[in-house]
């Protein structure tokens, strides 16, 4: 009648329903049942009984739960009549691009708005170098970004595969800007690279699709 869950490294989420609880590695499987979640930090322990939830540290110290509300539409995580998710995402690309730009570019194309980075624009302007990190197709997106940033912003750019970046000793300066790209916001190697960049005092910006994901919470700003 008791379930114990602990986090170390990989993400862990507790869904809070009415006299019921859910455990998952991210929020998407939970949203069908509840939009109230608790994100555990490393070394947090969740002790779950039928109608009771306790959060503790490894030292058995109690933790006050911080319940967050998910801003996810269940329709976004269903296949929508397609045979599989990859096919759905391929055919959704035109509408996805339009939705990405909607509300961010003025009607006359004279200005661009990114609310998630407004407070750090002075640091971005003062940056001497940009480091883009990601895995898989996120890394490929970073390679495209490299051409655009260097052509239009005239800013030196390095694109790094997160799983390689985290295991060497990269030279990172405080005036560097690190952009972490991840569709899920939970890519383990990218998360580790983010933490390495923050240890070296670099400003980290996250680009991901999932609000409330680990990357969206651990970066300094996000898009």
For the regions a language model picked out, list residue spans one by one.
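Glycine-rich phosphate-binding loops that contact phosphosugars or nucleotide phosphates
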Residues: 125-223
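N-terminal segments that mediate ammonia production and transfer
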Residues: 1-124, 138, 147-152, 165-171
